[in-house]
Amino acid sequence: MGKRIIIALGGNALGKNLPEQMLAVKETSKAIADLVEAGHTVAVAHGNGPQVGMIQNAFAAYCRQEPSADVMPLSMCVAMSQGYIGYDLQNALKEELLNRGLQQGVATVLTQVVVDGNDPAFQHPTKPIGTFMSKEEAEKMAREKGWHIAEDASRGWRQVVASPKPLAVVELTTIRALAETDNVVIACGGGGIPVIATDNHHLKGAAAVIDKDLASELLAEHLDADMLIILTAVEKVAVNFNKPNQKWLDALTPEEARTYIGEGQFAPGSMLPKVEAAVKFAESKPGRTALITLLEKARDGIDGKTGTRITC
């Protein structure tokens, strides 16, 4: 019997520009279609770290040329990234499904996610966005643009922005209705458009990027998923990452994960939210499993052949 699976796809896996994204979504679609073909019900959330940074930079450059132009709010940059990533991914996935004789629909839902305007994360930016830079380049941007910068898992330096905790998925009813009628749903792109609920049901955009792994976990809980698959740049989670005593982990209990988190084993804004999301999902209901692995290893991971599985 097929499982209900939520896939959390990293924004870095979608390429650094539009041509790269077109190629990336084709490969991504093959892996997703494998799961659909195997009889699973699938919903896909995706990151937007590189893409939302590029959108923000493009509008900032335009504002320098046109001083009367408005600065584009970060929440709108997230909305734009949902649109163009969803457009490419939806079309590539539908094409792949049809080529396999599969008739499932594919729908992208522009998704807002409620956050708390008083979340401490607004005072402590940790979420990497934009492209990787050298330390010298990052320090220059910090001086010239006032960016907060941080090293991202030893891969380079990036701008970091606020990443508040996701509280509620505004379009949940619509997403659930689509998922329950044989559609592959693309939702919570970039972690969702961050909004703050105000009086009279008004939703106000927030200057933040929600972590897509935590948003995916929230979506997975409310869609009553059996499995949350968090895709990343490595096949398994490791402790002592990039050190001589590095150790790959086949399985983790929530208790073991918390011990490693307490030791500072996982980088904030990178592997840490993935492990935190996996633990939260595994503990949310008996029988639920989270898997952290590479995109191309997702099907093997479901079968228990690879990846890091987090279960109670």
Where are these regions (language model features)?
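C-terminal catalytic "cap/lid" subdomain
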Residues: 2-312
